[in-house]
Design a protein with these regions (language model features):
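Flexible loop/turn segments at secondary-structure boundaries
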Residues: 245-247, 285-288, 336
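An amphipathic, hydrophobic-aromatic interaction surface with interspersed Lys/Arg
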Residues: 270-272, 309
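Long, compositionally biased
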Residues: 295-330
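Structured, contiguous alpha/beta core segments that scaffold functional sites
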Residues: 1-257, 261-263, 267, 339-355
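Short acidic alpha-helical/loop segments enriched in Asp/Glu that coordinate divalent cations
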Residues: 236-239, 276-287, 316-320
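Charged substrate- and nucleic-acid-binding regions of tRNA-handling and nucleotidyl-transfer enzymes
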Residues: 317-355
Length: 355
């Protein structure tokens, strides 16, 4: 009879895990991938597009090397280490140049970038990644524009994804879409004004009647046509006391708002943290000496924070065994690659003075 008197076991309740992985089904569904309307709007500004491309070209061309830290008796020394397979091909579907450049792009505009671990080796460490566009990521536990640490509640395309399989790059510089709205909005409105002015046909001369019987519209049109016809045959004109000739003082620099556009380009260079001269903005008498020095300026003032962010994130314990790390071979970019061009390039300041 015990079979009829035993109490049924209560149903087990399964708590929804914050790191659910339903979002992984959206990975590589490129039909749904987006880069964000704000980013697309920002990239319409030529100065910002130039700054972005310059910095992306640096990060995209740098090779990654692996090292191990060892004590040599005086200090910690970085000793070259045999690279893991993914260093040569981070994502098997694309080149390192591509994934690193677009990782930087996410850091620049959104302040964060994300890779998803698609494969792991037998020791549990990642061996292949794919990039998740930052515009498709939502952090449920961090809703502000400033990151406070790695998130454990990540949505990809609206679906939860396991944070343990997501490598989170957190930029030390706040994303442009959060800091540059006003400057970009001004630049776009200025560009719209310049476009309108470029389409307007301003007359070179205005004939204004200042006395006598008012002329009809047809008579005014005939007088203007006669004036234009006379200019084809002679540079001299004669008018009576009832007509005033007013030359148009509008010049191309005023019509196209050259000074305003130049100033706004400097503002965008400041926003992107790149030296203004690298984005072809006039800055008075300042000029660089060689392409090598320009490369150093671009690295020091613009690229270095993002390079450090990427290489330190990829050296973390969730990517590599403790004691090993990866870094960009920046010396080959700063010294070897541009050594010949630095020696052969003439002094830019002398060229300007001799022009």
């Amino acid at each position: 009879m015990g079979i009829f008197t035993s109490k049924p076991e209560p149903a087990k309740t399964v708590k929804a895990a914050a790191g659910g992985n339903a979002g992984a089904t959206q990975i590589n569904n490129f039909y749904a991938y987006v880069e964000g309307d704000q980013r697309a709007r920002f990239m319409q500004v030529p100065t910002l597009s130039r700054a972005r491309d310059l910095m992306a070209s640096v990060i995209g061309c740098l090779p990654l090397v692996m090292f191990k830290e060892m004590w040599n008796g005086d200090e910690m020394e970085k000793v070259p280490e045999a690279p893991r397979s993914w260093l040569r091909r981070i994502d098997k579907g694309v080149t390192n140049n591509f994934i690193l450049s677009w990782t930087f792009d996410d850091l620049l505009f959104y302040g964060s970038a994300y890779w998803f671990v698609t494969e792991r080796s037998s020791d549990g460490y990642p061996m292949n990644f794919t990039r998740l566009p930052a515009a498709m990521i939502t952090l449920q536990d961090q809703q502000s524009a400033v990151r406070f640490g790695p998130s454990k509640q990540i949505l990809f395309n609206g679906l939860p994804i396991d944070y343990k399989d997501v490598i989170q790059f957190m930029s030390p510089v706040q994303g442009l879409i959060y800091t540059g709205y006003t400057s970009i909005n001004t630049a776009l409105k200025l560009e719209q004004a310049r476009n309108r002015n470029s389409l307007s046909t301003m007359p070179a001369t205005t004939l204004r009647q200042v006395g006598g019987e008012p002329m009809s519209a047809q008579e005014l049109s005939d007088m203007a046509a006669a004036y234009d016809h006379a200019r084809l045959n002679s540079a001299t004109c004669a008018v009576n006391e009832f007509v005033e000739v007013i030359p148009n003082t509008a010049t191309p620099d005023k019509m196209l708002l050259i000074d305003a556009a130049e100033y706004q380009s400097k503002e965008i260079a400041r926003l992107a943290n790149v030296p203004a001269y690298l984005v072809s903005v006039s800055i008075g008498n300042y000029s660089y000496v060689s392409s090598s020095e320009a490369s150093r300026d671009l690295y020091t003032f613009g690229v270095k924070p993002y390079i450090d962010c990427i290489q330190e994130t990829l050296s973390a314990d969730n990517v590599l065994p403790r004691g090993t790390g990866v870094m960009f071979d920046i010396e080959s970019y700063l010294e070897n690659q541009y050594q010949d061009s630095a020696e052969n390039m003439p002094d830019m300041a002398n060229e300007v003075n001799n022009a």
